[in-house]
Amino acid sequence: MQSFELLSPLIDGSTKVSENEMYKTTDYLRNGVLYLNNLLRPQHKKLSTLMIYSTTKCQSRCKHCSIWQKPEEHLSLRDLQKIMASRCITKNTVVGLEGGEFILHPESTAIMEWFMRHHPNYTLLSNCLNPQKVIDAVRRYNPRHLYVSLDGDRDTYKVMRGCNGHDKVIEVVETLKNEVPISLMFCLSPWNTFKDMDYVIRVARKYEVDIRIGIYGTMDFFNTTA
């Protein structure tokens, strides 16, 4: 899963998101207070967001991410519980579970069940290559938000990610769009174009879901150096 630089939560005023508001006024106020706290009390900093790359296992073969070439490693449920015990994490900290592909983690169900019970303010990121497993996980473990990767149409998807996953992403979006807030994650890279970005924007409009646009960049953890 590629790291994202948020360009705009919505492309323009005609792009409608789902019935569930992505952000409320209280979210902005809370983050403002958090920023002031971290600025004025550096010894008592709190996190607004924590992304946990809990596994290197992934069934995609992406050109813009080489994590699938790394040795298989996982953070255990016990590891995650230790992280969550940190004093910089509060009940308002949004925790993102990703990888690799998080649902391939050998303890994925136990981890999601723990978060559902002890820190329900968590999100799930997925490539949706196992659509039924993603659908079942969302319905059973109730993540606050689902982020799914879509970098272009069928042809671009296959070129960029090395597999036929486009229709599986659409299946998950069609099935869950009225059950959980969904964001399409588009990464602009040397392997796709602005035409692909326009395509993904139109998909977001069709299903009335959010879209996030990021720009490809190098990152040691993903072995992205080109």
In which residue ranges do the predicted regions lie?
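Radical SAM enzyme [4Fe-4S]-AdoMet core and its adjacent flexible, acidic
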Residues: 1-2, 6-12, 75, 144-145, ...
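Conserved alpha-helical substructure of the radical SAM core
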Residues: 7-12, 18-144
